[in-house]
């Protein structure tokens, strides 16, 4: 018998944070925002997608998925029985018809990828989504080492347009999906 596990956060002491705690924090943040909200996250983080949908519903907003992998993961999650009870997403082409205080865009590009949806939105080359002064972009992810330069450049370009940027550095909007050291110790104890 062999056990193989993820050790990405083995050097992070204590236990990993809870998605439920992030959900509460993000709901609190979003409840106070008056214009468009753009959330950039890893599409593969289905729990974070569920958090975004939960916050959209609780704040009376529609949600629109932007980016191919966001659509692909959403569809796969539904096929596997996840995200069954969330509100139906709005097509990005129709989202511009919704009042600015009633829409959340959940998009790819949280690492500043040149072809990611957020980069295309920020550079005003996305065919369906635009942002403007007073909107808020939430980076609901951690910076992967090596992506700092392009991600800070993206964030700076957004801020220069008078758009608020919220990151894990200035608000509680992300917990890792990887187990911390104490979580790993617990797991090894359970399987002994």
Task: Go through the PLM ranges and name each one.
Residues 1-192:
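Acidic/His-rich, metal-assisted hydrolase cores and their charged scaffolds
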């Amino acid at each position: 018998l062999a056990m193989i596990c993820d050790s990405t956060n083995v050097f992070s002491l204590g236990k990993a944070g809870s998605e439920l705690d992030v959900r509460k924090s993000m709901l609190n943040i979003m409840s106070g925002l008056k214009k468009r909200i753009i959330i950039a996250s890893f599409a593969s983080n289905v729990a974070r997608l569920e958090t975004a949908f939960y916050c959209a519903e609780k704040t009376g907003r529609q949600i629109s998925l932007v980016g191919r992998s966001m659509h692909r993961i959403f569809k796969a999650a539904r096929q596997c029985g996840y995200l069954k009870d969330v509100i139906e997403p709005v097509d990005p082409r129709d989202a511009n018809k919704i009042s600015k205080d009633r829409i959340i865009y959940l998009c790819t590009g949280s690492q500043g990828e040149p072809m990611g949806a957020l980069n295309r939105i920020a550079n005003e080359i996305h065919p369906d989504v635009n942002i403007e002064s007073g909107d808020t972009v939430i980076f609901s992810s951690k910076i992967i080492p090596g992506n700092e330069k392009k991600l800070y450049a993206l964030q700076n370009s957004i801020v220069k347009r008078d758009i608020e940027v919220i990151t894990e550095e200035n608000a509680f909007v992300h917990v890792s999906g990887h187990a911390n050291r104490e979580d790993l110790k617990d797991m090894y104890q359970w399987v002994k």
